[in-house]
Design a protein with these regions (language model features):
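C-terminal motif of bacterial Sec signal peptides marking the signal peptidase cleavage site
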Residues: 15-18
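Sec-dependent signal peptide recognition
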Residues: 3-10
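Long, low-hydrophobicity, acidic/polar, solvent-exposed interaction domains
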Residues: 20-212
Length: 212
């Protein structure tokens, strides 16, 4: 009787253990464009955003990486997905000015898209990004001349110090997800993008003067 009880207990334990094992699924991996290639070439230094307190702390670490002539590989774990995103920023010791012509510009301050700064600082929540991307895709002048490929997007991004790191994570997940959704199987560079992390309030910068 005692032996029967022990055997039953073992069977129940094994069954429960097996069920728990079946519930554990490996997290999916989402990689931004060129991430794996740059990692293979040892041009990335990984930052797990779970180890970062806020945006100020993040951009400080990214700047140190930039001064080593490397890019930041940003890792975000959320639910069943690990997001692997390339982040760009400037090295404080480098006075070189970046040249960003022929781009589709997207500006994000905190968790809001800054639209038409000339229009009294009009903003939309980050969830509006899909609509913005669809609008860019629909306009022929946003494409590279004579190619089925959009001009690359330059996303200028800043988050105020008062916001938690979860704000940064949310925005980066949205960017990665929305751009991944428009990638074509036969044209992976259809709409490439770069995220430029800056340390100033983008929404307060006046727009460029209109052409004469």
């Amino acid at each position: 009787m005692k032996m029967t009880f022990n055997i039953t207990y073992i069977i129940i334990f094994i069954s429960v253990f097996s069920c728990n094992q079946q519930k554990i699924k490996p997290q999916a991996q989402l990689f931004s464009q060129d991430y794996l290639e740059l990692k293979k070439e040892n041009k990335l230094e990984i930052i797990d955003l779970d180890s970062v307190h806020n945006y100020k702390n993040l951009i400080s670490r990214m700047s140190k990486i930039a001064c080593k002539d490397k890019l930041s590989g940003l890792k975000i774990s959320f639910k069943d997905t690990i997001y692997n995103i390339i982040g760009y920023t400037n090295c404080p010791e480098d006075n070189t000015i970046g040249c960003y012509f022929r781009r589709n510009f997207i500006t994000i301050q905190n968790d809001s898209l800054i639209l038409e700064r000339s229009n009294k600082g009009r903003k939309e929540p980050i969830g509006y990004l899909k609509t913005m991307i669809d609008s860019i895709i629909s306009k022929p002048h946003n494409y590279i001349f004579n190619e089925d490929k959009l001009k690359p997007a330059l996303i200028q991004f800043n988050v105020e110090e008062k916001y938690p790191i979860n704000t940064t994570k949310k925005v980066l997940r949205e960017i990665a997800t929305r751009f991944q959704a428009v990638v074509k199987t036969d044209n992976p560079d259809f709409f490439s993008y770069s995220i430029l992390f800056v340390n100033y309030d983008i929404s307060k910068i006046p727009p460029p003067p209109p052409p004469k």
